Amino acid sequence: MEIATDKVGEVIVLAREMVQDSPAAEAELRGLVAAMDEDERAELLALLWVGRGDFEPEEWDEALEAAAEEPLSTLLDSQHVADHLEAGLELVGRSARDAED
């Protein structure tokens, strides 16, 4: 996985703020994700899917390939984005706590 853990952590924090009806957090999250390159967005979505249980960590390449075909809205409109990203980080051996610090 190439995306920086701290970048995923920033997405997690903003997604949690967005759930609390923060229009500013939503705008910042959309801007952050839109500024990512295609590979980072695909990795973020693949990570969400691993955390949600759609793919196993061992299926990372398949998840990444599928994520590359999905629009940005698939990530931003997903329920429980923060929880799934946090779980995905743990499943691929990265620390979500370190990402949020």
Where are the regions a protein language model picked out?
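Helix-rich interaction surfaces within compact, conserved domain-sized segments
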Residues: 67-101
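Structural motif
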Residues: 32-42, 76-80
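Short, hydrophobic/amphipathic alpha-helical patches that form generic packing surfaces
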Residues: 41-52
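Short, surface-exposed beta-strand/strand-loop-strand elements in extracellular ectodomains
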Residues: 55-66
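Short coil/turn segments at secondary-structure boundaries
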Residues: 46-48, 59-61, 100-101
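Generic amphipathic alpha-helical segments used as scaffolds and interaction surfaces in large
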Residues: 32, 50-54, 72, 76
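Short terminal alpha-helical segments
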Residues: 1-23
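Polar alpha-helical coiled-coil and adjacent low-complexity
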Residues: 17, 24-28, 34, 81, ...
